[in-house]
Amino acid sequence: MTPPAARRRSQFIDAVIDDYAAVHSTPPDPHQLELQRITREKTGGAAGMQIGDDQAMLMEMLVRAMGATRAVEIGTFTGYSALAVARGLGPGGRLLCCDISQEWTSIARAAWQEAGVANRIELRVGPGLETLRALPPGEQFDFAFIDADKTGYAQYYEEVLTRLRPGGLILLDNTLQGGHVVGDLPDDEDVAAIRFLNDAIASDPRVKVVLI
């Protein structure tokens, strides 16, 4: 059973229901719990950027179910989402992680090593868009996760989509912006960027979309 305090609560689901869902889901293992602890200890208020247990498990299951062997992540933070994706990859699978922070990704590197997935992950520190554009022509991905600066989402999406294999999957985090996408925050750049992207993807004939 996962202690409720270890979870990142949904902003849209009653706390009692959220706790019920946690009890009836596979809990995080010791490696994940330790990474959560270290992230809270080392990053302070920034720890809220870490995805929740339920999302991590869902990502691992999706990657495994689709038989993905090549994945990319834009925005790695302390490596919790990457740990989930790496665990779901098929034999010989590789995950490319892109992040701009040496400090936060040093936590990720140690966690991946401890969890036994470091050999599946390549970390490149630098602007994500530059990293993607520097990849060899024709390099494709089965799965992509975008969780970086919101004003850059549209460019990340386009760059990743051109490298996504037919039937591949792109996950974008924070696409509801805490519900503010339907609110009135005209001066918030992040919300405006996500609204723009949501509208663009919803009308993009190249993809099928679900926003949850």
Predicted region positions:
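A short alpha-helical cap/connector motif
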Residues: 1-143, 150-171, 175-212
